[in-house]
C-alpha cells in the first residue's frame, strides 16, 4: 500500500511539474503597457532560482495610488489608477498579498496564492460590491500557438454583468458571460486588425469598444474592464511577447 501511494504521489508531482513548465517562457518577455515597454526574465531562468514573477494592475477607479506587499516585503509602491507595473520576482511558493492605500499602514484587502516556480501572475486590484477593494490573482500564459495571437478579457467593473466579447464583423463571440471579478481564460485568434466589442447584460447600454487593435502573431493581449457602477466603463490594455519582437498593442 505504501509503495502504491508513493508511486501515485510521484505521478501527481510529475504531472504538476509538467503543467507548471507548460506556462513558463523559454525566453525573456517584453511587456507593453501605456506606451512603456519593460523586459522580464524567462520563466526557465526564474524557475532555476526557485522564483515566480508577479505584476500589479490598479483597476480601482478611486484616483488613489496603492501599495501591495507580499513575500515579506513591499512589492509595488504608489501605483496609480490604470497603471500596469513591470513583473517582480518572489521567492516563496505560498504568498499572502496585502493591498494598502499608498503610504498607509492598514491593509484594505488581502489574498493568498500558491505560486509555481517560473510562472507569471497578474494581481488585479478592483472594486468590490460595497465600494471597497479586493484582489484577483491570475496566472499568465502568454505564448500563443504558432502563428496566432492570444487575447483575454478581465471583468473588473461591477457595472458590467455577464460580458460578451466579440470582434466587430465576426458572427461568433470570443467569450460569453464573463461575470464581474472573472476572466474566461485566453483564446488564440488569427492575427488581424479589428475593433473589440464588449457588451454587458443590459440591452439598453452601448457596447464598450476597443478600436482598431492590431493583433500580431506571437503576442498575448489583455483587456481589463474597470469603473464604478455609476461611472462609464474604462479599459486598461497591455500585451506580452517573448523577446524577438516588442511592438505593442496598437490603438489608432
Language-model-detected regions and their locations in the chain:
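Intrinsically disordered, low-complexity polar regions and short flexible loop motifs
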Residues: 20-252
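Sec-dependent bacterial lipoprotein signal peptides
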Residues: 1-18
Amino acid at each position: 500500500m505504501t509503495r502504491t501511494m508513493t508511486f501515485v504521489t510521484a505521478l501527481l508531482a510529475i504531472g504538476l511539474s509538467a503543467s507548471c513548465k507548460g506556462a513558463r517562457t523559454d525566453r525573456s518577455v517584453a511587456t507593453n503597457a501605456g506606451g512603456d515597454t519593460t523586459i522580464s526574465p524567462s520563466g526557465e531562468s526564474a524557475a532555476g532560482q526557485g522564483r515566480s514573477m508577479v505584476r500589479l494592475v490598479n483597476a480601482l477607479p478611486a484616483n488613489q495610488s496603492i501599495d501591495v506587499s507580499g513575500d515579506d516585503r513591499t512589492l509595488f509602491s504608489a501605483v496609480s489608477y490604470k497603471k500596469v507595473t513591470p513583473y517582480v520576482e518572489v521567492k516563496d511558493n505560498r504568498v499572502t498579498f496585502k493591498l494598502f492605500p499608498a503610504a498607509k499602514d492598514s491593509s484594505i484587502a488581502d489574498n493568498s496564492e500558491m505560486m509555481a516556480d517560473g510562472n507569471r501572475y497578474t494581481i488585479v486590484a478592483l472594486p468590490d460590491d460595497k465600494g471597497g477593494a479586493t484582489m484577483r490573482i491570475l496566472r499568465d500564459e502568454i505564448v500563443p500557438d504558432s502563428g496566432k495571437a492570444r487575447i483575454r478579457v478581465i471583468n473588473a467593473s461591477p457595472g458590467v454583468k455577464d460580458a460578451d466579447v466579440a470582434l466587430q464583423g465576426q458572427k461568433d463571440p470570443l467569450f460569453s458571460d464573463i461575470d464581474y471579478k472573472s476572466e474566461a481564460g485566453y483564446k488564440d485568434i488569427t492575427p488581424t486588425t479589428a475593433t473589440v466589442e464588449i457588451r454587458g447584460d443590459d440591452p439598453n447600454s452601448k457596447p464598450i469598444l476597443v478600436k482598431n487593435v492590431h493583433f500580431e502573431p506571437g503576442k498575448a493581449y489583455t483587456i481589463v474592464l474597470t469603473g464604478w457602477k455609476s461611472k462609464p466603463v474604462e479599459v486598461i490594455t497591455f500585451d506580452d511577447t517573448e523577446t524577438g519582437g516588442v511592438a505593442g498593442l496598437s490603438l489608432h
